[in-house]
Curated annotation (Swiss-Prot):
HAMAP family: Glutaminase. Substrate binds at residues 61, 111, 155, 162, 186, 238, 256. InterPro entries: Beta-lactam/transpept-like, Glutaminase. It catalyses: L-glutamine + H2O = L-glutamate + NH4(+). Homotetramer. It holds the Pfam family Glutaminase. Belongs to the glutaminase family. It comes from Pseudomonas fluorescens (strain Pf0-1). One of its GO terms (molecular function) is glutaminase activity. This is Glutaminase. It comes from the Bacteria. One of its GO terms (biological process) is glutamine catabolic process.
Length: 302
């Protein structure tokens, strides 16, 4: 496995320079583009990594999985009364579809859906941002995971579209807490700094029927784990979920910080990171690395 990871990074490294680092969040636009890392974590507890796997980065939308899991853990099936689990077919920050469907987001991985999930968690936790940070520390086994305050503030200052979605949902009765407070929590989640090793470990319960081996916790039931993985497979990569299924064939979740996490049910979790994005907002080199890894080992679930 170690030799294969080194070989794959060497093969995809020439793609660096062909994408673009996210700059609509100013604090992300300063990240050096020439970075590439990968980590593979097995259900047997073995970790394999290569490249810049220990370099922390902003998880961004990858955090939506953690928020969803928290909501399921504490609120159960009731969350699905407020949002769906269908692909949207629209941009992740679309207002048009949200209004047409009367404030009920299609799934928890578009921004509107993630905001509803944060609203649910805001009602459940006294300090949602701290609860999320501590939850992720527990899942990753890394007590040093922190929120990047500069990134969180940068996102809050450019919150107009997310605020518009929240207020629109509030007008339809599907948003119950103070919008600004929920946005603060949401951006705090997105601004978590983790590396490939942290994320591969943090997602391991999704490859193991909901059981986190290194913390000894049953995070989700087997059925709930299947449900989260299925939504990742259909909606986890913005408008490129179909292409990811075609090329990689695994449940996955990406973020504009350049990270992608993929789950091999029953076997492994993988995190790859390279900050340059393709036109769909997913890591260009990261997609290629995951495609090569899945193809070489035969991991596709299809």
């Amino acid at each position: 496995m170690q030799a294969l990871l080194n070989e794959i990074l060497d093969a995809v490294r020439p793609l660096i320079g062909q994408g673009k680092v996210a700059d609509y969040i100013p604090a992300l636009g300063t990240v050096p583009a020439n970075q590439l890392g990968i980590a593979v974590y097995g259900n047997d507890g073995e970790m394999y990594c290569a490249g810049d796997a220990e370099t922390p980065f902003s998880v961004q939308s990858i955090s939506k999985v953690f928020s969803l899991v928290q909501a399921i853990e504490h609120s159960g099936e009731a969350i699905w009364e407020r949002l769906g689990h269908e692909p949207s077919g629209q941009p992740f920050n679309s207002l048009v579809q949200l209004e047409f469907e009367r404030g009920r987001p299609r799934n928890p991985f578009i921004n509107a859906g993630a905001l509803v999930i944060c609203d649910i968690n805001q009602s459940r936790f006294a300090a949602p941002a701290l609860s999320m940070r501590d939850f992720v520390r527990r899942l990753s086994g890394n007590p040093q995971v922190m929120v990047d305050g500069k990134v969180a503030d940068s996102e809050y200052q450019h919150r107009a579209r997310n605020a518009a979605m929240a207020y629109l949902m509030q007008s339809f009765g599907n948003f119950h807490n103070d919008v600004e407070a929920v946005l603060r929590s949401y951006f705090s989640h997105c601004a978590l700094r983790m590396n490939c090793i942290d994320l591969a470990r943090a997602f391991c319960f999704l490859a193991n029927d909901g059981f986190c081996k290194h913390s000894g916790e049953q995070i989700l039931t087997r059925r709930q784990t299947q449900q989260v993985n299925s939504i990742m497979a259909t909606s986890g990569l913005y408008d490129e979920a179909g292409n990811f299924a075609y090329r990689v064939g695994l449940p996955g979740k990406s973020g504009v910080g350049g990270g992608i996490v993929a789950v091999v049910p029953g076997q492994f979790t993988v995190c790859v990171w390279s900050p340059e994005l393709n036109t769909a907002g997913n890591s260009l080199a990261g997609m290629a690395a995951l495609e090569m890894l899945s193809s070489r080992i035969g991991w596709s679930v299809f």
